[in-house]
Amino acid sequence: MLTLSDFDFDLPPELIAQTALPERSASRLLEVDNTNPSAPPRLIDRRFAELPACVAPGDLLVFNDTKVLKARFFGRKASGGKIEVLIERVTGERTALAQIRASKSPPPGTTLTLADAFDVTVGERVEPFFTLHFPDNCLVLIERHGRLPLPPYIEHAPDAADETRYQTVFAANPGAVAAPTAGLHFDDAVLAALEARGVERATLTLHVGAGTFQPVRVENLAEHRMHSESYELTDALVEKIAATRARGGRVIAVGTTSMRALEAAARDAQAAGRPLAATRAETDIFITPGYRFRVVDRLVTNFHLPKSTLLMLVSAFAGIETIRAAYRHAIDARYRFFSYGDAMLLTRRDDAAEATHGGA
């Protein structure tokens, strides 16, 4: 049985990208050709701008169109004590769930002043979050007064460049507290080249939660509990997936968030004995080696943290040894890692179930 230690690796800290490159599609792309099960994977170093040459007319790229909220606030209690608030999810026009860092957990009814701009009232606890009641439309107040919640491994304070580059060019639906980072490499030129090549596009929405950065704290992966995130698939997306299948094209997920939404919806549909359909739901799907993929044929993704659930996901998709070889190559070739880093293009290995944990 696989354990957490099976997904550890040594990463030189200087390979953690701290800023975005001047041009989105100037990032590197490691194409991993693992289609021959009797041979080692072929690792091809490219620029991301070459992606259109790596996909075929009739393929379908599925993007996550979530938009990152300016979800981080610094503030104070009425007593003057300092607090830090990270909005996890907007739940209504004037309500949200949030993490609160303070010397002592604020009880219901506590008033907090955020960004020296407005007050919120603490409501009921919804573990591990607090309900916050805003005085006005919370999306407006968050956008006006909040700070971009850069990942914990990015060491600088967010600036004007981050406000552009930590969003995808197709971000449309506010609600995430972390970017769907595989999408950050796409610029208008790459999207136009994909269209010219006859590659279809579709979108879904999965609002990435702060739990995406939470470490796995148990060695036995069966004991890990994933955070829950909300997602939505539309009729238009489902129809495009069916049309792609009918013409022999491949479904290519842009990012692990798109992957998780597609696979969660397909798994739940299969369990209910129905075909994939438009849906709005929550998912805490945890994809590990042994999982049987139902929708996605290829995956565009960044390089992930050691011992992370996302590293487990890509290992399930492409094969553990394939991913280990690709990561060794990426480190040796000085690829940039994590949110502002470079990308990989993976193909599903139907024999990737090198271990049986994960099933379903």
Curated annotation (Swiss-Prot):
Enzyme class at the top of the EC tree: transferase
Q: Which gene encodes it?
A: queA
Q: Which PANTHER family match?
A: S-ADENOSYLMETHIONINE:TRNA RIBOSYLTRANSFERASE-ISOMERASE (PTHR30307:SF0)
Keyword annotations = Cytoplasm, Queuosine biosynthesis, S-adenosyl-L-methionine, Transferase
InterPro entries hit by this protein: QueA, QueA_dom1, QueA_dom2, QueA_sf
The record lists the organism as: Burkholderia mallei (strain SAVP1)
> What is the role of this chain?
Transfers and isomerizes the ribose moiety from AdoMet to the 7-aminomethyl group of 7-deazaguanine (preQ1-tRNA) to give epoxyqueuosine (oQ-tRNA).
Query: What EC number(s) are associated with this protein in UniProt?
Result: 2.4.99.17
Give a yes or no for keyword Secreted in this entry: no
Question: GO molecular function terms here?
Answer: S-adenosylmethionine:tRNA ribosyltransferase-isomerase activity
Any one GO CC term of this protein is: cytoplasm
Name of the protein described by the UniProt record? S-adenosylmethionine:tRNA ribosyltransferase-isomerase
